[in-house]
């Protein structure tokens, strides 16, 4: 009997199996501090991360996530060049001062300017000579009525009486110059008139519109990106670093392997200043192994996602609440943050995950229905949906995620063993609407627990295990819902 019992290491719980216990509180929900850590050196103003999935996070989602205080992880089901370009798009989306603005040479044409504006989503481009000296600026107003695409840009750019500021000009001073001259783009030049940056009125305005936006030291939005473990992993990492990525995630279905750590060591040795997060894992042993080998963050979750079938297909997994609890306890005090990836169904699951020890939560299905996700929009029976698929689905594997499930050597689609499905989720509108509900639920949970910040929630949060009857009692019951709430459906 004992021999049989030794095979059972314990009992696994999900978020539905527990509730946080209310505690004495002297803080209001609006007063709590929800800042946290994404990785060893990357902070979050909101502890929410969008998943590296090809129906969840591309540049639009990453921009919106960072503007709301979180961070997006760009998926890798694309070429290295495409992924690097999306990193650059996020980094250029807004800035205190754009330190590497898109420029065009004096030989450029109207067609070149229009193409660049469309590619990068910008409204003005400085024109420089071969020595990077500023010669003019062209804006979308200059191009709006120009029909001749072959016309040289020098014929329509503004070159006389250019308004510029010197290096070291503060944003407050720049705002005065912009308003005083009624312009939207302000080139920053050095003593020899070389272009060193660009300040835009739009970026200054966003500082007040999005005060909790997650930005780097240059005022640019933060963004992370995923790499795999195959031959191009280090090359992909190099391109991402050169594009300005803030953190890299080595994204696999099973992070507790020698091959994953080999990639981790190689990336860290070549790019020591970049934080590298590794996942996915579910045990204390895996967490210690990755931390001991230099991981700057660990991602927890084997099979909790709504579109994941790993636990059914492979018979392997770990209920998510227990996995987060075990991993967080194992590496407590190491300075390495924990990302709880998957299994978040309701806003109340967020404070549960954080109280269990996670520093942030990664979401897929709850974000896939937003306007900013790259999933296809579908009309079904008169309602709007967006497509959502697991990275272990056959369709996603065909696009490039086979290595995540260690099937990269298999070319025959019929021989792929999927660990995910393809589905749809209801359309939810713009991301900021959903984020308000996520943040509101987190703040409410922290208020009930008397936690002034996330570290306090992690230290003092206590749970009660509930039965199936307790779960039923927690949900609306004995009533027909006649008006849907924005943060609840079942």
Predicted regions span which residues?
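Catalytic cores of alpha/beta
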Residues: 60-63, 235-243, 282-300, 340, ...
């Amino acid at each position: 009997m004992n021999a049989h019992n030794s095979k059972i290491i314990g009992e696994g719980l999900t978020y539905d199996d527990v509730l946080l216990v209310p505690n004495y509180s002297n803080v209001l929900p609006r007063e709590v501090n929800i800042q946290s850590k994404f990785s060893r050196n990357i902070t979050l103003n909101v502890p929410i991360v969008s998943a590296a999935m090809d129906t969840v996070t591309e540049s639009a989602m990453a921009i919106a996530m960072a503007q709301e205080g979180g961070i997006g992880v760009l998926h890798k089901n694309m070429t290295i060049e495409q992924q690097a370009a999306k990193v650059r798009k996020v980094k250029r989306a807004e800035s205190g001062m754009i330190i590497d603005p898109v420029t065009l040479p004096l030989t450029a044409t109207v067609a070149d300017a229009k193409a660049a504006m469309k590619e990068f989503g910008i409204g003005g481009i400085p024109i420089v000579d071969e020595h990077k000296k500023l010669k003019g600026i062209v804006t979308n107003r200059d191009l709006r009525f120009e029909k001749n695409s072959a016309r040289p840009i020098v014929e329509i750019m503004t070159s006389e009486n250019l308004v510029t500021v010197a290096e070291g000009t503060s944003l407050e001073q720049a705002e005065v110059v912009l308003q005083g001259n009624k312009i939207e783009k302000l080139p920053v030049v050095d003593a020899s008139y070389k272009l060193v940056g660009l300040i835009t009125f739009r970026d200054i305005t966003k500082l007040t519109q999005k005060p909790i936006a997650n930005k780097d030291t240059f005022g640019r939005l933060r963004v992370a990106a995923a790499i795999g473990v195959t031959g191009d992993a280090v090359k992909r990492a190099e391109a991402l670093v050169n594009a300005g990525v803030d953190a890299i995630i080595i994204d696999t279905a099973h992070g507790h392997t020698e091959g994953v750590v080999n990639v981790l060591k190689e990336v860290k040795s070549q790019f020591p200043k970049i934080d590298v997060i590794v996942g996915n894992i579910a045990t204390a042993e895996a967490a210690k192994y990755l931390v001991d080998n230099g991981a700057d963050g660990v991602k927890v979750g084997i099979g909790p996602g709504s579109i994941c079938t790993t636990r059914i297909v492979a018979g392997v997994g770990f209920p998510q609440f227990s996995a987060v609890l075990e991993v967080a306890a194992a590496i407590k005090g190491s300075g390495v943050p924990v990302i709880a990836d998957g299994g978040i169904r309701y806003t109340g699951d967020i404070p549960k995950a954080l109280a269990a020890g996670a520093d942030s939560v990664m979401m897929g299905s709850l974000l896939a229905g937003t306007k900013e996700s790259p999933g296809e929009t579908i009309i079904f029976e008169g309602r709007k949906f967006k497509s959502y698929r697991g990275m272990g689905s056959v369709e996603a594997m065909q696009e490039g995620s086979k290595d995540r499930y260690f099937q990269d050597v298999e070319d025959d689609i019929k021989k792929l063993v999927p660990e995910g499905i393809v589905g749809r989720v209801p359309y939810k509108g713009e991301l900021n609407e959903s984020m308000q509900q996520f943040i509101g639920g987190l703040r409410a949970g922290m208020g009930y627990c008397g936690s002034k910040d996330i570290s306090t929630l992690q230290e003092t949060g206590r749970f009660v295990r509930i039965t199936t009857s307790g779960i039923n009692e927690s949900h609306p019951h004995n009533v027909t819902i006649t008006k849907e709430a924005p943060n609840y459906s079942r």
